[in-house]
Amino acid sequence: MKALPSTKERFALALRELLESNSFESISVGDIVGLSGLSSRTFYNHFRDKNELLAYLYRITVEPLWYTDGKRNSLETFFTCCKDNFHYNGTLKGFGNALSYYGQNDLRSEIENKGVEDLVRLLKWNHFPGAITPELREVLRFFMCGITRYFEKYYLDSKTIQVDWLYTFWINCVPAYLAEYLVKEPE
């Protein structure tokens, strides 16, 4: 028997559905609440605003892409999963509608923050010998910023730019002492 979605997941599913055909700015909390079948009070008991819900939706959508058949993916496989989820099954497509919003709690910031945490986790998984310092996190953030800007350009330019080479390009730009631990295949 399949478990029912949690309250947070119900709001996230409603937002995902709305993002398929609407810009993020045009979606109101009332729209999300109406589609979810829950109350505004329940929404605000779980989220500060729709931006926090969008961040939650992003996290629960991307986290499973790190794993295939219960095994951890390499960074290259993760990039491929993200690309495939954008192109083929539309899982990530709705997020493109939210990239045009700049402001407090914007999706871009969430992608960069989650990306840094994912890369730190990958370094730890691959037994990176150095300390995870604030400076190291800033190096990783710099590269995550580049990826989000490229993805945004790709989305806004009607997919005229190829993303197939993004992993190779990105990993060649990362300092070698980090790249070695980011590209290792899972043990």
Task: Give the location of each predicted region.
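Short hydrophobic clusters on alpha-helical segments that form packing/core surfaces
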Residues: 7, 11-19, 115
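C-terminal peripheral helix-coil segments that are non-catalytic and often amphipathic
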Residues: 153-187
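Amphipathic alpha-helical packing segments from all-alpha helical-bundle domains
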Residues: 103-130, 134-149, 179
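DNA major-groove recognition helix of helix-turn-helix
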Residues: 11, 15, 47, 54-58
